[in-house]
């Protein structure tokens, strides 16, 4: 009987802790979305691209969305251009500032197609881990994103390559980690102002994908099905 009472008390305490955690947002534990790790690993496991010294060099900088369509772009331009994606996932502008010069290397790039935004606008904990809680801050708020992107553009312009900025692709409600659908348009608007001021060509993947999300994008996910990645590649 004593053990039974003790067990009841333990259950009551645990229940109270769970309820308190839920009220304070701690119950929204991060669940990684399908696609990002999978696409990044797939890219890393691919054989190095064979370089044709007589063909122009094209660098694609971006996150897992661009990793998803780079292979299709490479197929489309086979025999016409060397298409390279930056190693791994370019993630947000903070990582971009840290690694851009390394990604550029000493290659003479003819075209650089780039994007940042999807990781900047996602919500993270104070320690920087992905969060499903919209009350948590964004990885880079709009002001920080704007400042970072301006500096990245400055560095990219120094390469003398033809620059093309791809707008951040849209996504539905309920993606994990937390990204509010309306933020993609806000971050794109800030980016477009920077590109306009620097006479940089735009590739509006946001407008291309928006009316077709239900058929081309994974359910409650920022990543695209194979056909969706192919569609993006055709416009790239």
Regions found by a protein language model. Give the residues of each.
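A generic, residue-level signal for flexible/boundary positions that often mark functional hotspots
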Residues: 14, 59, 216-218
């Amino acid at each position: 009987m004593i053990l039974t009472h003790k067990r009841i008390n333990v259950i009551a305490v645990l229940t109270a802790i769970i309820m308190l955690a839920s009220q304070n947002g701690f119950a929204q534990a991060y669940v990684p979305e399908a696609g990002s790790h999978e696409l990044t690993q797939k890219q890393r496991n691919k054989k190095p691209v064979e370089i044709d010294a007589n063909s122009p060099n094209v660098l694609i900088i971006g996150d897992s969305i661009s990793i998803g369509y780079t292979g299709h772009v490479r197929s489309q331009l086979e025999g016409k251009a060397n298409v390279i994606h930056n190693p791994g996932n370019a993630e947000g502008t903070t990582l971009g500032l840290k690694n851009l010069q390394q990604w550029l290397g000493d290659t003479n790039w003819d075209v650089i197609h780039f994007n940042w935004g999807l990781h900047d606008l996602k919500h993270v904990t104070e320690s920087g881990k992905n969060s499903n809680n919209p009350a948590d801050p964004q990885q880079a708020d709009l002001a920080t994103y704007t400042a970072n992107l301006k500096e990245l553009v400055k560095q990219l312009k120094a390469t003398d390559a033809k620059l093309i900025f791809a707008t951040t692709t849209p996504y539905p409600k309920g993606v994990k980690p937390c990204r509010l659908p309306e933020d993609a348009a806000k971050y794109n608007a800030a980016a477009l102002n920077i590109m306009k001021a620097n006479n940089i060509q735009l590739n509006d993947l946001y407008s291309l994908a928006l009316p077709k999300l239900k058929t081309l994008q994974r359910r409650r996910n920022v990543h695209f099905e194979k056909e969706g990645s192919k569609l993006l590649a055709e416009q790239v």
